[in-house]
Amino acid sequence: MAAAAVARLWWRGILGASALTRGTGRPSVLLLPVRRESAGADTRPTVRPRNDVAHKQLSAFGEYVAEILPKYVQQVQVSCFNELEVCIHPDGVIPVLTFLRDHTNAQFKSLVDLTAVDVPTRQNRFEIVYNLLSLRFNSRIRVKTYTDELTPIESAVSVFKAANWYEREIWDMFGVFFANHPDLRRILTDYGFEGHPFRKDFPLSGYVELRYDDEVKRVVAEPVELAQEFRKFDLNSPWEAFPVYRQPPESLKLEAGDKKPDAK
């Protein structure tokens, strides 16, 4: 019954619209609402504009952190997108992270990401990056430190529990050792994997390849074999529309090793 009532009202609206336009010399057209995009969407900037007020506030807070922890803070900078970066000594991981988490003017209680960057040309090739978030002040900060292949860095699990699996991933991918980690083992690669794939000196082909051996009924690891003595690229394909125009028959015979017949 409700559907029938709605249909009757809709039909009455059509008849009413046609009656209004009758006798005016114009065709009876039912105008339907059209959804239009706002004009402001086209003029909206695609890049975040520079906020000078926020830039000054972040610079002042960075200087404040450097004054309180001068032993560990080595450099403070604000990026063009108003992101504060603090570069610290490797010995200051725990003190700096604890300060940023507990201080009244910081309250960076969330570790949103922890990663590493490999720059082989540097003496300390690995850069460890901590990205922190303060919900209290709606602000972010990036803490950077450095290490090499042999020097361990203090684990941040005692400050942020979320650093547990992040540090395992860095150990697995880059080979950076975190001291005092509760369970530092590989997390992405397979058991017995050799090397660390995210290092710049790691070969693209890897060191071993895995395959299923039907004789032993299990997956086995073997050295990578990519060498080929001879590779012949046959450009003719039966799936092409005009395969005969790809290469003349004479060149095919010459490629196969036949001698060119003497011209008579």
Swiss-Prot record:
InterPro entries to which the protein is assigned, alphabetical: NADH_DH_suC (IPR010218), NADH_quin_OxRdtase_su_C/D-like (IPR037232), NADH_UbQ_OxRdtase_30kDa_su (IPR001268), NADH_UbQ_OxRdtase_CS (IPR020396)
Q: Where in the cell is it found?
A: Mitochondrion inner membrane
Transit peptide as a keyword of this entry, yes or no, is: yes
Q: Could you tell me what reaction this enzyme catalyses?
A: a ubiquinone + NADH + 5 H(+)(in) = a ubiquinol + NAD(+) + 4 H(+)(out)
Q: What is its EC number?
A: 7.1.1.2
Has the keyword Hydrolase been applied to this entry? no
Q: What is this protein's function per UniProt?
A: Core subunit of the mitochondrial membrane respiratory chain NADH dehydrogenase (Complex I) which catalyzes electron transfer from NADH through the respiratory chain, using ubiquinone as an electron acceptor. Essential for the catalytic activity and assembly of complex I.
Q: Quote the subunit structure annotation.
A: Core subunit of respiratory chain NADH dehydrogenase (Complex I) which is composed of 45 different subunits. Interacts with NDUFAF3. Interacts with RAB5IF. Found in subcomplexes containing subunits NDUFS2, MT-ND1 and NDUFA13.
Q: Linked disorder?
A: Mitochondrial complex I deficiency, nuclear type 8: A form of mitochondrial complex I deficiency, the most common biochemical signature of mitochondrial disorders, a group of highly heterogeneous conditions characterized by defective oxidative phosphorylation, which collectively affects 1 in 5-10000 live births. Clinical disorders have variable severity, ranging from lethal neonatal disease to adult-onset neurodegenerative disorders.
Q: What is this protein called?
A: NADH dehydrogenase [ubiquinone] iron-sulfur protein 3, mitochondrial
